[in-house]
Amino acid sequence: LPVRTAEVIQDILKSSMSESHRKGVSFNVLSNPEFLAEGTAINDLENPDRILIGGDNKDAMLALSKIYKTWVHEDKILFTNIWSSELAKLTANAFLAQRISSINSIAAICEVTGADVREVSRAIGKDTRIGSKFLDSSPGFGGSCFKKDILNLVYLAEYFGLQEVADFWESVVKINNWHQNRISKLVVKKLFGTVSEKKIVILGFSF
């Protein structure tokens, strides 16, 4: 969701309630983003890395945390303001997408130099500051989340006059688009210039 969604929803709810309805009614809108991955959603829900609850009402935030505490250790429950919670969701996806574009850009260099991107990935992945996740060269990222969330960051940066920041994140999408186009051309080249009437098998196709 775009940053400030919770704030907008709360304003809409407040403005739609008449004075008579407001009496004795109390509500709070919280931000509670999910960090589930396709294919591992159930396990991610049962064993989350963290639970993020953003809001400005401590009682409401604690009430929601009690639900999670029935199966999640309280050390994994994080409390932030709404802005931080909503931005953390966008940033998490942006960082994952950035890793994909980064290793794919290195893959292009490996191809022209004779290096093996798998060996490079394994070597840098041993660095504990970097880690090994999301370092497999691939056709790039797709789906409905990564690109959307990055462009949301781009819009946000441009809105606040941070053009260099916007350009940085937009480059992640540009690299991804360039890499996907490069891969498609490589496939056609390997199939002698055409895919017409050719049988192509895609292994591990997923979201």
Model regions: which residues?
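Structural/interface elements that position substrates and couple domains in central-metabolism enzymes
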Residues: 1-207
